[in-house]
């Protein structure tokens, strides 16, 4: 009888690899004095936890671990709070399934 191995989401995400394009992030947050409610929501709903509030209460992004799932684009793209494009060819997330 095989033992059932339960794996956490974090363990599976750890298997992914990233090719970062230095100096060319594929996501940027529009400059703002006060973050919109949708930007604040991104700090909670981004599955890779790429969005954070800094010490000045500004939403910032660290896109190095981005899964390119598009959650942020759906939530904030139509309002112009973020600018989202696909990474250049050969860069971005490399999914490892299994």
UniProtKB/Swiss-Prot annotation:
It comes from the Bacteria. To ferredoxins from P.putida and C.tartarivorum, ferredoxin I from A.vinelandii, ferredoxin II from D.desulfuricans. GO terms for molecular function: iron ion binding; iron-sulfur cluster binding. It comes from Rhizobium leguminosarum bv. trifolii. Coiled coil: none annotated. GO terms for biological process: nitrogen fixation. Keywords: Electron transport, Iron, Iron-sulfur, Metal-binding, Nitrogen fixation, Plasmid, Transport. This is Ferredoxin-like protein. It holds the Pfam family Fer4_ETF_QO. InterPro entries: 4Fe4S_Fe_S_CS, ETF-QO/FixX_C, Fd_FixX. Could be a 3Fe-4S cluster-containing protein. Transmembrane segments: none annotated. PANTHER family: FERREDOXIN-LIKE (PTHR43082), FERREDOXIN-LIKE PROTEIN YDIT (PTHR43082:SF3). The keyword Transport applies.
């Amino acid at each position: 009888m095989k033992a059932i191995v339960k794996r956490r989401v974090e363990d599976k995400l750890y298997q992914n690899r990233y090719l970062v394009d230095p100096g060319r992030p594929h996501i940027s947050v529009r400059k703002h004095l006060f973050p919109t409610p949708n930007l604040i929501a991104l700090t909670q709903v981004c599955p890779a936890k790429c969005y954070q509030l800094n010490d000045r209460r500004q939403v910032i992004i660290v896109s190095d671990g981005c899964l390119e799932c598009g959650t942020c684009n759906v939530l904030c793209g139509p309002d112009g709070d973020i600018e989202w494009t696909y990474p250049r060819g050969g860069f971005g997330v490399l999914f490892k399934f299994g």
